[in-house]
Every structure is written in structure tokens, then in C-alpha cells.
């Protein structure tokens, strides 16, 4: 009778059909595996079997007699070439003729497949009685199903689902062993697909009646199992399947024993997980919080938000200066964890000590000083006494500090600068003795730009002449002696060429100096040479110069010197002696006069002594 096997692969919850080359390779691997199991008649059937065709049944003695030695040799040779591919073999699928074995070994391939199928069917029938006792234990495991159960039994359930052949059987042909394996499969698939209602039809009524009603799993169960854990389970399941179906006949018993011990260890771990629900709940909350926001913030002092706050506060200190003293409080604001969503004020532990070591210290101070090297302390600058306050910072992992910029220890350079700025003696800045720039003329204080000289300078003469030109020949007809238009014009010919200025206009100009009228009248009498109520050019310029000298603070001289009158019509080429030089010269003159007086007194004294001695 001819058997046809269609090779498929179970991956990611779906069954994928293999290629022709992969199907031929997997068929060879299955033949070698069944040949190894046929040699072990006394050993129990492995928990994972391939699909069986009930139509091909041969007796066990006939299978053992037909070419056992030849198949063992062929299996040993094929183990080096067969890849480890996990397959299933449903019925009614035939492989293509291109990838089948050679014509010489065609009969061997078909006979080996028939032998393997018959052997698997017979051994499953014999082990059904033994596995009925284990089905009750597996049913109780399903009652105790928890989120931790899915993670613990995921390896066994996936290995049985990927290598088992229950998918090719009908619900009536499934054994209790297969049902127990399906219970484990549904416990794991319920965590991944969030429902297990579509896994088993209503044919298993007897087994469902024996099971008590259990509490449904939470809907967020799948989120507790990370993607990394699922990949690990897949890798472990593939490793266990490959090791379980290894082609070495000497290690088959050891592998079967390991599978039984792993199941017992799983049951023990399940009991431990059920006895400690509080620990499991706390672990689930931490995993969900970490899964939603990535890695946990193990060092909150160096998070991105705190670095931004630190830079902002540093910029504010540079622009607005340091914080005032009344803003530094004795207690700090501490934020609680984000899980509770509450903000509380807790007084943090703070020690009012400095980094200066004293000769006499208590045990508490020694412990506090030793903790400086452990890195559990923070520093805060105290501007009142130019020190750094130290306080404990053991709870920095769970609390976020708002004033992080003030809690870090300043650099050595900043501390030295602060000490120099506070301790250095500030010297007052003195103005230089020598004049660094030219002073401008101050109209409100004209005496500050005046030098004591005895003649009219060129700048002063130009300023006075401009006023003379703008005010001469005005209102002269008001004078009594000024000739009329119809009168004699002989008097006009005797007037000076530069012209004249009316005395009333001169008085109005000089009054702007705010000098007293008596002083102005005295100046006018000293410069008036015409005695007819008018002033000529020389008299007006000299009078203006005397007014300025009075404004500079000099006393009005009794008689105007001739050098002043001469400087009006000439350009003075003499150098101006500075005031300091004039003062030094005057001091030297006084000193010489004192020396002269002393010498005169000595001579008089000598004369008196000689006169007395002679007498």
C-alpha cells in the first residue's frame, strides 16, 4: 500500500507548507527517527509523534524481522546529512517525483514509512492506558492556570504543538494523551491570542465535565509576556525538540527522563507562583510600566528634563544674578512616584555642617565625614558665611529634585574665584594727576577753562569782534550831537573808520553776565575814552575782556595795563606759561625773599655786637 505525506511546518501560529526539497529532507529525518524508536521496544513512546494512518497496520514482530541491520546502517549514514526540520505529515498529499529517492532505494523508502507508521500507531495504543492516569494530573494543571503558568509551560506546549500530529486526526480519534497536550496548548495560546474558545470543539464533553469552572484570564495577559520571552520560548522549544528527536539511540531514554523531570519542575514552580500572588502582582506592575515607557529612569538626577532645568537655571543666574537669601528654605519639595500620581512635601535630611575639619569631632561627625567619600552627600552654597552646606542624598534614586543646579558641588575654579572676590581688599580708584584729555569750555563754569594771563588772546579777540560787528552803527541817531540829514555833515567826517557802538546797547550786552550794575559801571568808566556815550572798537573789546576776567574770579584792576590795549591790535606771539609753573615761580620768589630777610637780620646782629664790643 502506498503512503503519501505532505510536509508542513508550524511557525508563528500558522502552518506553512514546505518546499519539495525540504519535504524530502524532512521525510528522511522522520524515517531515521522512527527507525531508532523501532529498536527500543521496551521504552515508552515519546510524547511527540507524527501523524498515523489507521489503514496501514502491521504486526510488531514482522517489523522487527524485516531488514533491521540494514536499516540501522543506513540510518547512521543518513544522520550526518539530515537537517533538523520540524514537520508534520498529514494525509492525502503526495510529494513530487523529482525529489524522491533513487529507483534503487524506492522500495526501502516505502517500506520504512509503512513500518514507522504502524509502529507509532501500535505504541500509541499501548501507551494510552498508561497515559490515562496522567490526564487527571494535567487537567488539574489547567484548573490552576495563571499568567505565570503560560510562561512556565510554554516550552512544553509549543513543542507538542509543533511536532505533534493531532491536527491530522479527527476529534473521535484523539486519545486522552492528545487531549492533555491540547489543554497545555490552549493554556499558552490563550495568552497570545487573548481567547481559547476556538481551540477545542464541543466533542470533549466528558473531559469538560470533570474540569471545575475556572476564573477567566485577564485581557491584558498577553502584554505581560514580552516579545523577548516568546522568542526565548521558541528557541528553547526548538532546542528541546531537536534534542528529543536526536538520532543517537543511546540517549533516547535519558531525554525522555529529562522531559518528565522538566514537567515535575514546572509543577513545583507553578505551586510557588500560586503561593506568592503579591510578588507576582508587583512584578507585573513594574513590567507594564517599564514596557510602556522603555527603560526605567534609574538615575533621575541626570535625565533630560533635569539637564534642561539645569541649563535654564544656569542662564537665569548669569542674567538675573544669584537667588536672594530669603528664597532658600529649610525644607525641600520632594515629588512622590508617578504610579500614585500625588505630590507631597517631605522634609529631607540636611546637616548644617561645612567641609572644614575640626580638631575635636564626635562619632557622628566622623561617620558623616566618611560618607563624603561614598558619594551619598550633596553640597549647597551658603552665601551668608561663604561655605557649602552638606546634606544626605540617599533617596535621590526615587525622588526628583527641583533645584538640581544648586545641589551639585561647584568646580574648584569657581570656588577659588568666589573666595578671591569676597576676601580681596578693594582699593579705591584715584584719578590720574596728569590731564588725559582736553576739557571742553563750560558756559556755566567758564572760570575752569581760564588761565591767568595779562593780555587778550586771539580766540577771545575774535569772539569779541563778532559781537562788535553785529551791533555797531545801530541807533546812533538817538544821540543829541548826531547830525541830522538836513544839517551839517562835518561831524560825520570826524568819526573813526571802524565805527561806534551806542552805550545803551553795551549795557544790555554786559547785563547778560549777571554781574552787579555797580561793577559794570566801573568797567565802563575805565574803558570809555570818548566821553560822548559811545565806545570805539578797542574800548569795547577791552571792556568785554574785563567782564570775563570778573566772571573768572579775578579782581578788577585799578588801571588797565598798556599791554592789554596793545594786544587788541596785535597778534600776541608769546607762549602761555601754565598756572602750575607760575605758582612754582612765585613760591621760589617767596623763598628767596625769606633768605634775604634772614641775611639782613644776621648782618644787623653782627653790627650791633661789634658796636657794643667797641664801646
Curated annotation (Swiss-Prot):
Region Disordered, residue ranges: 38-135, 152-260, 277-304, 323-445
Q: Which superkingdom is the protein from?
A: Eukaryota
Q: Which of UniProt's keywords are assigned here?
A: Lipid metabolism, Phosphoprotein
One of the GO biological process terms: rDNA heterochromatin formation
A single GO CC term for this protein reads: phagophore assembly site
Query: Which segments show compositional bias classed as Polar residues?
Result: 50-65, 248-260
Return the protein name.
Increased rDNA silencing protein 4
Q: Which organism is it from?
A: Saccharomyces cerevisiae (strain ATCC 204508 / S288c) (Baker's yeast)
Which gene underlies this protein? IRS4
